[in-house]
């Protein structure tokens, strides 16, 4: 799939192994999610347009550049929250809007319970954030909500995905790039990614 980008960075592979480990404590887990999120952001923003900006250094005038687009972050609650702060560290001017979606454990279908989008679109690029792309239901629903809202450019950033989730998101929204740290083997009968890392939300917030 042309729109699927899986990181090949050695540090991503290293940190992802630590993240997956069952004995990794919540504090370390959060740190690793933060670090991996910044690696993914770097790769997902390589095509950001720039505009010229004139500044003064302590020694002389300088003609530099700044990001030309307004960026919005859309974390899918609750696990997506773990990816917000590290991205804001790099793009502090980004707007943040929350979408609450949970997966019904009986049907494995997404249910929307919270939507904090403003009345009108005021960004050029939306980054949907969710550590896990399992069935793809929540990601598909989130992107659909953003498109109905009027967002024109959308990218998905996730740490680990199952082929089923990637396929579902790509088929529903083929124009949305998918940036991942890893693509795993399959989903089990409970809808969990295998080998995966378990429930990202529980591990982030110590509720498992």
Curated annotation (Swiss-Prot):
Entry binding sites for 5-phospho-alpha-D-ribose 1-diphosphate? 78, 103, 130-138, 199
Query: Which class of enzymes does this protein belong to?
Result: transferase
Q: How is its activity regulated?
A: Allosterically activated by GTP.
One GO biological process term: uracil salvage
Which cofactor(s) does the record list? Mg(2+)
Q: Which reaction does it catalyse?
A: UMP + diphosphate = 5-phospho-alpha-D-ribose 1-diphosphate + uracil
- Provide the alphabetized UniProt keywords: Allosteric enzyme, Glycosyltransferase, GTP-binding, Magnesium, Nucleotide-binding, Transferase
Recorded GO molecular functions are: GTP binding; magnesium ion binding; uracil phosphoribosyltransferase activity
This entry's Enzyme Commission designation comes to 2.4.2.9
What does the record give as its pathway?
A: Pyrimidine metabolism; UMP biosynthesis via salvage pathway; UMP from uracil: step 1/1
Q: What InterPro entries would the database entry show?
A: PRibTrfase_dom (IPR000836), PRTase-like (IPR029057), Upp_B (IPR034332), UPRTase/APRTase (IPR050054), Ura_phspho_trans (IPR005765)
Q: Which residues of the sequence carry a binding annotation for uracil? A: 193, 198-200
Bound cofactor: record note: Binds 1 Mg(2+) ion per subunit. The magnesium is bound as Mg-PRPP.
Which SUPFAM superfamilies does the record cross-reference, listed alphabetically?
Answer: PRTase-like
Q: Which Pfam family is an annotated match for this chain, by its short name?
A: UPRTase
Primary role = Catalyzes the conversion of uracil and 5-phospho-alpha-D-ribose 1-diphosphate (PRPP) to UMP and diphosphate.
State the similarity comment.
Belongs to the UPRTase family.
Name of this chain's protein: Uracil phosphoribosyltransferase
């Amino acid at each position: 799939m042309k729109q699927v980008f899986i990181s090949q960075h050695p540090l991503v592979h290293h940190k992802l192994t630590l993240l997956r480990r069952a004995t990794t404590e919540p504090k370390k887990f959060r740190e690793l999610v933060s670090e991996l999120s910044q690696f993914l952001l770097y790769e997902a923003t390589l095509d950001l347009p720039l505009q010229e900006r004139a500044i003064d250094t302590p020694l002389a005038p300088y003609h530099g550049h700044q990001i030309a687009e307004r960026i919005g972050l859309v974390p899918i609650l609750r696990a997506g929250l773990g990816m917000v702060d590290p991205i804001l560290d790099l793009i502090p001017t980004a707007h943040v809007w929350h979408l609450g979606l949970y997966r019904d454990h009986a049907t494995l279908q997404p249910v929307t319970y919270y939507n904090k989008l403003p009345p009108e679109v005021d960004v050029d690029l939306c980054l949907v954030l969710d550590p896990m792309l399992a069935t793809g239901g929540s990601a598909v629903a989130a992107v659909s909500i953003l498109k109905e809202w009027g967002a024109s450019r959308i990218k998905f950033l996730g740490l680990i995905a199952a082929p089923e989730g990637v396929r579902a998101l790509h088929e529903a929204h083929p124009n949305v790039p998918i940036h991942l740290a890893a693509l795993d083997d399959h989903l089990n009968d409970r809808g969990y990614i295998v080998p995966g890392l378990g429930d990202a939300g529980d591990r982030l917030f110590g509720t498992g």
